[in-house]
Each structure stands twice: as C-alpha cells, then as structure tokens.
C-alpha cells in the first residue's frame, strides 16, 4: 500500500518509475493496475521452461493504468514466488532481477527510479538480493511504532549493515506508517535516532486507505486533495531530495523491548 502510493507520487513529479513487487503474494502493484494482478516474472519463466531468451519486456513489465494522470510514467513488475509450501520464497526476487537485467529494462525504459517493494522480514537471502547485490542505492523501512514491527525493522537494519561493505547499501530512513498508537511519532523518531538514522515522513492512519485498497486504486484516484495524499507527496519529495544516509545499528529483542517500554512515556527515549 505505502509503496504504490510513493511510486504514484514520484511519477506525479515527472519521474519515470519502475515498481518491482518482491513478495510471493504478488500484490504490490495491484493499486497501480486498477486492482489487476499481472503475470509474475517467475510464472512467465515457468511457462517458458526458464528459457530467458524467449521472454520479452512486454511479458513481464506493464504500464500503470493511471499514467495519463501523471506527468511521469509508472511501470510495474511482480517477481512472484512458489506455490505455498513449495520452494524458496525469495527465488522469484532473484529471477526477476536477473531477467530485468538481461532484458536491459533499466536502460530501455529510461528510468529515474527503481522501487523494490521487499517483504518486511528478511527471512530468506533471496528477499535481500536488492540490498545484497547493490541494486538498491537507498533503503527505506516502513514501520509502525508497534514492538514486533520495530523488531522487524531492526533486523532489516542489521541486514543493511551486513551488506554495506559488499554493496554499499545504506539506509535512507524510516517511513512511519502510523497505527494510532499513543505517542507513536515520538517512538518512531526516537527509534530512528537510536539506530543512527532519521524518519523521512509519517503516513497517517486512515480508513480512506483501506477503502481505496478494496477498490483497487490509490488515494490519488479517489481523494487527490486529502491530507493523506498530501502526506505521500511530502514523503516522495523527502525521499527524492534525501542525501542523508546511514549504516544503521540494530537491537536485540530484549534491548528493544526494554527501550520501547520507556520510549512510550512522555519525553521517553
């Protein structure tokens, strides 16, 4: 949800964006394609018996249904994954990136931005490929102020730090996806500072976002003048203009829990 709105907001700035969904559920680009689920890279390769030479760019990359509303362009691709319970979930990410490279998608589409929407818990090496192999120059973590979500964010920070020497990957910051938790902005701001990074923007909790998801569109189609759209525009501007990067630290669950319990208090850190 958050990533598709960022892609739309960036394209509205006149940028050419490739949005690559890196989740076996292959639903990252759904709101950019009027609720449709495109054929995934992995499914396309399976149908061609993994003969990459038989795959064209048009087979796996699709223009957003809403490009006529943008001054830029949005292109969509979904990596895909195995059937539930079968195979490695990260295989689709590996195959997608290799196929896009083979087809020179990044050059032929004349892109300004490639956005990889990666599964939050880095439980498989395949999901970390955009970070590990240097495909992602900047990493942004979407997080609420909830304890378990912050722990997942901390683990991603650990992966960024681990791969920095290999790929130069750096953290651009935290995107606060608010869940109406008490003092949530304070918790997220302090969490970012604790890990040596920054919050680049906050997305308010909103029933409008749920409504748009159910209708298969972004907020920009139904509520273009809403405060929520304003938040996404501001966030996209912060990301595009950001020049502050970090090799973050991380926390164990025990340390995080102790810190989090104090951080929720007034002026807690």
Question: What are the roles of these predicted feature ranges?
Answer:
Residues 1-5:
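Phosphate-binding Walker
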Residues 6-75:
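N-terminal phosphate/diphosphate-binding loop that engages ATP/GTP or pyrophosphate donors
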Residues 12, 102-113, 118-205, 209-211:
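Conserved catalytic-core segment of NTP-binding enzymes
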Residues 24-26, 81, 120, 180:
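Short, glycine/acidic-enriched loop or turn micro-motifs at the edges of active sites
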Residues 28, 77, 96, 117, ...:
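Residue-level signature of catalytic and energy-coupling elements of molecular machines
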Residues 81-91, 147-148:
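Flexible beta-alpha connector loops of hexameric P-loop NTPases
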Residues 83, 92, 97-108:
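Hydrophobic alpha-helical segments and helix pairs
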Residues 161-269:
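C-terminal lobe/tail of nucleotide-utilizing enzymes
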């Amino acid at each position: 949800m958050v990533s598709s709105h960022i892609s739309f907001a960036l394209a509205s700035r006149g940028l050419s964006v490739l949005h690559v969904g890196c989740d076996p559920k292959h639903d990252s680009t759904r709101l950019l394609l009027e609720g449709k689920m495109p054929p995934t890279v992995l499914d396309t390769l399976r149908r061609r018996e993994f003969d990459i030479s038989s795959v064209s760019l048009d087979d796996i990359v699709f223009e957003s249904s809403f490009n006529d509303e943008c001054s830029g362009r949005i292109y969509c691709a979904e990596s895909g994954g195995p059937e539930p319970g079968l195979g490695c979930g990260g295989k689709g990410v590996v195959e997608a990136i290799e196929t896009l490279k083979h087809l020179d998608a990044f050059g032929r589409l004349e892109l300004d931005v490639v956005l990889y929407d990666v599964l939050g818990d880095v439980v498989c090496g395949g999901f970390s490929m955009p970070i590990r192999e240097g495909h992602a120059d900047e990493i942004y973590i979407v997080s609420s102020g909830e304890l378990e979500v912050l722990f997942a964010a901390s683990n991603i920070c650990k992966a960024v730090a681990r791969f920095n020497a290999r790929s130069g990957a750096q953290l651009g910051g935290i995107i606060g996806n608010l869940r109406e938790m008490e003092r949530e902005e304070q918790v997220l701001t302090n969490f970012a500072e604790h890990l040596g990074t920054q919050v680049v923007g906050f997305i308010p909790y909103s029933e409008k976002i749920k409504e748009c998801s159910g209708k298969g569109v972004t907020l920009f189609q139904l509520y273009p003048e809403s405060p929520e759209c304003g938040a996404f525009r501001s966030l996209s501007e912060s990301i595009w203009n950001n020049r502050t990067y970090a090799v973050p630290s991380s926390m164990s669950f025990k340390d995080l829990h102790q810190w989090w319990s104090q951080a929720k208090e007034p002026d807690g850190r």
